[in-house]
From Swiss-Prot:
GO terms for molecular function: mRNA binding; structural constituent of ribosome. It comes from Parvibaculum lavamentivorans (strain DS-1 / DSM 13023 / NCIMB 13966). Belongs to the bacterial ribosomal protein bL12 family. Coiled coil: none annotated. Keywords: Ribonucleoprotein, Ribosomal protein. GO terms for biological process: translation. This is Large ribosomal subunit protein bL12. The keyword Glycoprotein does not apply.
Length: 123
């Protein structure tokens, strides 16, 4: 058996505790940390996640809640719809109130509708 094959065989026979101790011993001897590659990989993944962050949202009225008249007033103010159209939108929930809104605008609309008593989703 070659030296490398013997090392592989010996490592395969270690218990979990022995393997952990071996890892610590090698870290000390070589002056490295086993956690470093994980941290580097996580740091490399963060910019990719930030690049994929959603910038446009659809504001969806999930349910009007108990204060339907207040919700209709807010929908009219937000969308500029007439009374009948706003009423139909609210009663037909779930419906999209605003499409492709910026993150700030979507959050503002959501807050307005929730204050009026509606249940709102951002997609």
């Amino acid at each position: 058996m070659t030296d490398l094959a013997k090392i592989v065989e010996d490592l395969s026979n270690l218990t979990v505790l022995e393997a952990a101790e071996l890892s610590k011993m090698l870290e000390e001897k070589w002056g490295v940390s086993a956690a470093a590659p994980v941290a580097v990989a996580a740091a490399g993944a963060a910019p990719a996640a930030a690049a994929e962050e959603q910038t446009e949202f659809d504001v969806i009225l999930a349910a009007a809640g108990d204060k339907k008249i207040e919700v209709i007033k807010e929908v009219r103010a937000i969308t500029g719809l007439g009374l009948k159209e706003a009423k139909d939108l609210v009663e037909g929930a779930p419906k999209t109130v605003k499409e492709a809104a910026s993150k700030d605008e979507a959050a503002k609309i959501k807050a307005q509708l929730e204050k009026a008593g509606a249940k709102v989703e951002l997609k």
